[in-house]
């Protein structure tokens, strides 16, 4: 039996997260009053020997007095020795405002006397006890719908299977550092295929770029150092009950060097861990700017 509590700001993706969990076999209950959590836990405890999975959505539609009780409810769950964890979905206020504008939905706390900005600020304050007690916080500011679905699935499914999910994510520093990264490695000091005209339009997935980078001594030295570091410390993360870890590898544009390193690391650690993923966040962004600026990568 496993219990996941999902909370977060309105517009941050809580409903999407619950739908993902429902798709992978969780029994989902949305907008559960916090005051009813002990009663639900008691029922779950009766059937805790059964292989069931539950996901509960808790949000600002609760009375504010109930939300303040959440830390006490977490203590109750721990005392019952139930396997559970809490996910909190967050997002920057400007992104939330844009999402509400695009969907034309009304914020649950906004009214004639409360602006959208004020409603978001009030919600942040009301949900603070849940955010502080959460095991995982996911910032969805820069995630689209599909990326959020994949991230929730990777992290929750990996945790319920008692494994540590590992994500290698390549990116370009010029596009910003991934907000959910646990470890960040900087590959901008390595020889850059961008300055080879025939390699410029290619990526770290292409054979010519791979061949070029494998011929560079410094590239191989950095790869060996990262591999050694992760080999040494990933078991410690796993022993500390981590359900996931995101390892970001960055170069300037996220097209060549970071892609190559991420792919190679993924291939190596696939041999030792059950759930290893790779994601290339910015690999195609250079195509949009290729004719306008020298987007180094």
From Swiss-Prot:
<dbReference type="InterPro" id="IPR053930">
    <property type="entry name" value="RapZ-like_N"/>
</dbReference>
<feature type="binding site">
    <location>
        <begin position="8"/>
        <end position="15"/>
    </location>
    <ligand>
        <name>ATP</name>
    </ligand>
</feature>
<feature type="binding site">
    <location>
        <begin position="59"/>
        <end position="62"/>
    </location>
    <ligand>
        <name>GTP</name>
    </ligand>
</feature>
<keyword id="KW-0067">ATP-binding</keyword>
<dbReference type="InterPro" id="IPR005337">
    <property type="entry name" value="RapZ-like"/>
</dbReference>
<dbReference type="Pfam" id="PF03668">
    <property type="entry name" value="RapZ-like_N"/>
</dbReference>
<dbReference type="InterPro" id="IPR053931">
    <property type="entry name" value="RapZ_C"/>
</dbReference>
<protein>
    <recommendedName>
        <fullName>Nucleotide-binding protein CJA_2809</fullName>
    </recommendedName>
</protein>
<keyword id="KW-0547">Nucleotide-binding</keyword>
<dbReference type="Pfam" id="PF22740">
    <property type="entry name" value="PapZ_C"/>
</dbReference>
<dbReference type="GO" id="GO:0005524">
    <property type="term" value="F:ATP binding"/>
</dbReference>
<dbReference type="InterPro" id="IPR027417">
    <property type="entry name" value="P-loop_NTPase"/>
</dbReference>
<comment type="function">
    <text>Displays ATPase and GTPase activities.</text>
</comment>
<keyword id="KW-0342">GTP-binding</keyword>
<comment type="similarity">
    <text>Belongs to the RapZ-like family.</text>
</comment>
<dbReference type="GO" id="GO:0005525">
    <property type="term" value="F:GTP binding"/>
</dbReference>
């Amino acid at each position: 039996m496993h219990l996941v509590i999902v909370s977060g700001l309105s517009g941050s993706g809580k409903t999407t997260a619950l739908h993902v969990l429902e798709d992978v076999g969780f029994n989902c209950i949305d907008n559960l009053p916090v005051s009813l959590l002990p009663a639900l836990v008691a029922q779950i405890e009766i059937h805790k020997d059964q292989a069931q999975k539950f996901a509960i959505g808790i949000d600002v539609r609760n009375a504010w007095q109930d939300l303040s009780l959440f830390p006490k409810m977490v203590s109750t769950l721990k005392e019952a020795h139930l396997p559970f964890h809490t996910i909190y979905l967050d997002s920057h206020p400007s992104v939330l405002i844009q999402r509400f504008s695009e969907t034309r939905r009304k914020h649950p706390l906004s009214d004639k006397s409360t602006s959208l900005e004020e409603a978001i600020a009030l919600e942040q304050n009301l949900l603070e006890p849940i955010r502080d007690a959460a095991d995982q916080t996911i910032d969805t500011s820069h995630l689209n719908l599909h990326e959020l679905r994949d991230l929730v699935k990777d992290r929750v499914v990996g945790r319920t299977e008692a494994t540590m999910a590992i994500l290698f994510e390549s990116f370009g520093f010029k596009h910003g550092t991934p907000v959910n990264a646990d470890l960040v490695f900087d590959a901008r000091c390595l020889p850059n295929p961008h300055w080879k005209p025939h390699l410029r339009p290619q990526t770290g997935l292409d054979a010519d770029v791979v061949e070029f980078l494998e011929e560079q001594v410094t590239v191989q030295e950095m790869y060996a150092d990262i591999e050694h570091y992760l080999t040494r410390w990933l078991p410690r993360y796993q022993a500390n009950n981590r359900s996931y870890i995101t390892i970001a590898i960055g170069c300037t544009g996220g097209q060549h060097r970071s892609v190559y390193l991420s792919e190679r690391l993924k291939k190596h650690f696939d041999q030792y861990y059950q759930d290893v993923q790779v994601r290339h966040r910015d690999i195609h962004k250079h195509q949009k700017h290729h004719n306008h600026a020298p987007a180094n990568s």
